[in-house]
Amino acid sequence: MHSKDMDFVQMFVCFLLCWTGVDAVFNLKYTVEEELRAGTKIANVTADAKVAGFALGNRQPYLRVISNSEPRWVNLSPAGLLITKQKIDRDAVCRQTPKCFISLEVMSNSMEICVIKIEIIDVNDNAPRFPTNHIDIEISENAAPGTRFPLEGASDPDSGSNGIQTYTITPNDIFGLEIKTRGDGSKIAELVVEKTLDRETQSRYTFELTAEDGGDPPKSGTVQLNIKVIDSNDNNPVFDEPVYTVNVLENSPINTLVIDLNATDPDEGTNGEVVYSFINFVSNLTKQMFKIDPKTGVITVNGVLDHEELHIHEIDVQAKDLGPNSIPAHCKVIVNVIDINDNAPEIKLLSENSEMVEVSENAPLGYVIALVRVSDNDSGANGKVQCRLQGNVPFRLNEFESFSTLLVDGRLDREQRDMYNLTILAEDSGYPPLRSSKSFAVKVTDENDNPPYFTKPHYQAMVLENNVPGAFLLAVSARDPDLGMNGTVSYEIIKSEVRGMSVESYVTVNSNGEIYGVRAFNHEDTRTFEFKVSAKDGGDPPLTSNATVRIVVLDVNDNTPVMTTPPLVNGTAEVSIPKNAGVGYLVTQIKADDYDEGENGRLTYSISEGDMAYFEIDQINGEVRTTKTFGENAKPSYQITVVAHDHGQTSLSASAYIVIYLSPDLNAQEQIGPVNLSLIFIIALGSIAVILFVTMIFVAVKCKRDNKEIRTYNCRVAEYSYGNQKKSSKKKKLSKNDIRLVPRDVEETDKMNVVSCSSLTSSLNYFDYHQQTLPLGCRRSESTFLNVENQNSRNAAPNHGYHHTFTGQGPQQPDLIINGMPLPETENYSIDSSYVNSRAHLIKSTSTFKDMEGNSLKDSGHEESDQTDSEHDVQRGHYADTAVNDVLNMTVPSNNSQIPDQDQSEGFHCQDECRILGHSDRCWMPRVPIPARAKSPEHGRNVIALSIEATTVDVPHYEDCGTTKRTFATFGKDGPDEDRAEQRGRRQTAEPAVCSPKTNGAVREAGNGREAVSPITSPVHLKSPQSKASSTYNTLKCRDAERIANHSLLRQPEGKDSEPAMREINTLLQDGRDKESPGSKRLKDIVL
């Protein structure tokens, strides 16, 4: 509170003391910060009064505030609590006083007075604030450095150190800031000019002025300080040049620009505003011919210039600013008046409207649009004028003596261009020539030359069925580029029929091309229809064009399903089923029709009510079937309600009430369900597939059997040799008689007889000691003579394949025969000393012979080998037995040897089983007598030599040795041996090929003989031949070869074990080396 208020309080307190006679007066002082919210407790006066000696007596204390001193900021309760009434704002209570107090006087019930003073402590809750957002100061550029300009200060309601303490300005070199303190303690700022100002260099400055208080933390406020430098008239106007020279044509029109003068003054305002004027001593003629604009300095022609009167004008001009003490600037302008052809041609358009002429777009070429007249007041050549049209336009000028005509010179089309701006240029013959121009417009008027055209040739609209008659369907649009009535288009529907009715009964079109439906469409009746719309303009005659409109009527779910099966009577159908019907029994099938399409017509069936526990329905096909059996206590009838509803967006449905009677007379087994065509179709396809599969298997088996017969029954020698083997396990020792020399008295002395058979092949497979049969290479055997080969031919290429070629050696080199058969040489088994002396090599070697199926050697009468036959023995002698004991006994007889014929009624090989089961092929094989051993001196040289050679070539092809299919089951049963021999002879005469591999390879010369090298083959690759045999082979009849082979087989009926045989062979070979006989010498050569 102010001091005056405090004095009044003290005086009032003294008055109370004197008037009431109080006992004592006490003082209490409190200090609080401003901005306390209402209801804040300041102190407990009762407690503080006791401390201060304020005796309240023994009575209950009671305090009251004297009414004249009650403040509006605080409140004292009777119990002595001092509380704020409202938020205390020191700045509102005490303004700018250094200290702020509020006081109140309190009287107790003991008549004692207490004076309470509350000091309000200032809080820095206000930031300095400037009265405006910017401060503008104008300073003359003549202001000297050190000049001060007071600035408007900021205000801060806070006091003391929380008030404004300082001002700052944006740092710069031109102005500074000085802070001063007033008498009331407030701070003010003064702007100080520190450097000379130049407005022409910089006319404005902008800084930021900041006021900051002393609070903690301090608060601040800012304002923008704008300083404008005021100009002073310290510059004079200056012209660009002191003298200007210009040329002006005579008869130049008034206001023709002569020159634009420019004098600059860098001062501002009136100090820089320049005015122009002629100097007072300029002649009056010059002032009449020319004038100058005081503000712009533009000199223009003010009269008629005539070169003949005065051809030079000198004009003196001055320029000065409007500032005080202005100093003017001067310049001189020299004007030369140029003599010229000063009369230009004049052009006039002789038409009703000199600015525009009209022409129809159908105007023909040469059509006259307007007349043009051109004149020139000059005489002579200066008055002779030529005219032309400017630009590329479909017009031309036709010039005559005194006028010209404007003609159409091209096709006009208003739709392309409806207006032409023409300019006629006229030029006289003066020097320089004068030109003039005349511009006018040519408007092309419209003709009805364009028919309307639709924006597209086909329109389509989709509308839902059951539309409201008169509903908008679509709009067609046609355009006509013509104007007026020629471009006004009207529409109409071309007459046609839709389902036998006029199309106008379906749709209509208005003048704007909007098509509306006349009737409600039905998708089920009319799904789509087309019609044509004609667009016609208003020309005379009118032009038309057409467009096709297609209306597609979309389906709406507007058809309720209709029950068709079973037949309903008043919505009810009765069905009878057997009482003993089981689960899944077909009661009936519900069928309904819906004429809608898609989802609107797809129906689903369901049972909505009734005896649903006993029946169920297929949602798709509507079959009603039982779900449980009916017992003895079943009702006589059951009822269900079947509903068929479609799948439209708003589903429609139909229901049927089905009464199902249980009849004991019907039998549940008599039901024949509906035919499932899909199942029948699948079963039929499966049956066809099975039949085809079985047929393929049958054909494959038959082909395999035929191939087996072709591969198996082709060499009779092997067939006879195997047939003479006995089941006896008794082994016969090899004697010297088993090795014999073959006499040389055969048909040709330089050839030897070799049984050619595809079974004499070399295989890279390991030797199978459990194979029981000898596979034969062809169905009949033939003997082939080979030319004698020189000894040097033994150095042939090594074996690289499966097949070998047998070649003869020289006549002086006998070969080794074991049991009538030459010992073969394979790629793993060679006839040399190491192999002969090594048992292990012989056992591990691979033979050129392959066992044939033993089952095929015995016929049980069932046309094929029967493995259950008594002759079938899987433990029969091994291939080595046949190869060493039986096959080696086959020798080549001389020409004088006779082979006796066998009994035709019963063969030599017949057994008791033949009388019961029938004869087999082996029964008809003739018995060949054992030939006498040759004692000729040359016996040692005439032997069969087998030389194993191989050449790596393509797989050979075997030729079928007979056209008649032969097996062991049919051999000897299709005719006598003589007939078969004749047939074979005829075949061999016409076809001299052999069964051995075809010699597609080269035939190499070697000494006096020739070596036929056969291609490599494998027993498993038997193909048809590609070429005939080499001429090196001479073929014998198979019958002769069979007799020779059989003759040897009869001498050795039993098999021979390979190991004992080889031991005996080694012994014999050792004996032969000691004697050095020709035969042993030949054997040594073979072995080496």
From Swiss-Prot:
Residues 25-678 are extracellular. Residues 859-875, 1071-1088 have a biased composition (Basic and acidic residues). Ca(2+) 13 binds at residues 465, 522, 524, 558-559. In the embryo, strongly expressed in the developing nervous system. At 12 hours post fertilization (hpf), shows a segmental expression pattern in the anterior third of the neural keel with strong expression in the presumptive forebrain, cerebellum/rhombomere 1 and rhombomere 4. By 24 hpf, expressed widely in the brain and spinal cord with higher expression levels in the ventral telencephalon, dorsal and central thalamus, optic tectum, central tegmentum, cerebellum and dorsolateral regions of the hindbrain. GO terms for cellular component: membrane; plasma membrane; postsynapse. Keywords: Calcium, Cell adhesion, Cell membrane, Disulfide bond, Glycoprotein, Membrane, Metal-binding, Neurogenesis, Repeat, Signal, Transmembrane, Transmembrane helix. Ca(2+) 15 binds at residues 557, 559, 594, 596, 600, 646. Homodimer; antiparallel. Interacts with cadherin cdh2; the interaction confers robust cell adhesion activity on pcdh19. Residues 31-130, 131-239, 240-347, 351-454, 455-563, 569-676 form the Cadherin domain. One of its GO terms (biological process) is cell-cell adhesion. Residues 792-813, 851-875, 970-1032, 1067-1088 are annotated as: Disordered. Ca(2+) 5 binds at residues 141, 200, 231-232, 234, 267. The chain crosses the membrane at residues 679-699. It is a single-pass type I membrane protein. Ca(2+) 2 binds at residues 34, 91, 122-123, 125, 158. It is found in: Cell membrane. Ca(2+) 10 binds at residues 361, 413, 415, 449. Glycans are attached at residues 44, 262, 284, 377, 421, 486, 546, 570, 676. Ca(2+) 1 binds at residues 34-35, 89, 91, 125. Changing residue 314 to K: Does not affect melting temperature. Abolishes homophilic interactions. One of its GO terms (molecular function) is identical protein binding. This is Protocadherin-19. It comes from Danio rerio (Zebrafish). Residues 1-24 form the signal peptide. Disruption phenotype: Disruption of the columnar arrangement of neurons in the optic tectum and defective visually guided behaviors. Increased spontaneous firing activity in the larval optic tectum. Morpholino knockdown results in aberrant early brain morphogenesis due to disrupted cell convergence in the anterior neural plate with mutants showing an abnormally wide neural plate. Mutants show impaired directedness of cell movements and impaired coherence of movements among neighboring cells. PROSITE patterns: CADHERIN_2. Pfam families: Cadherin, Cadherin_2.
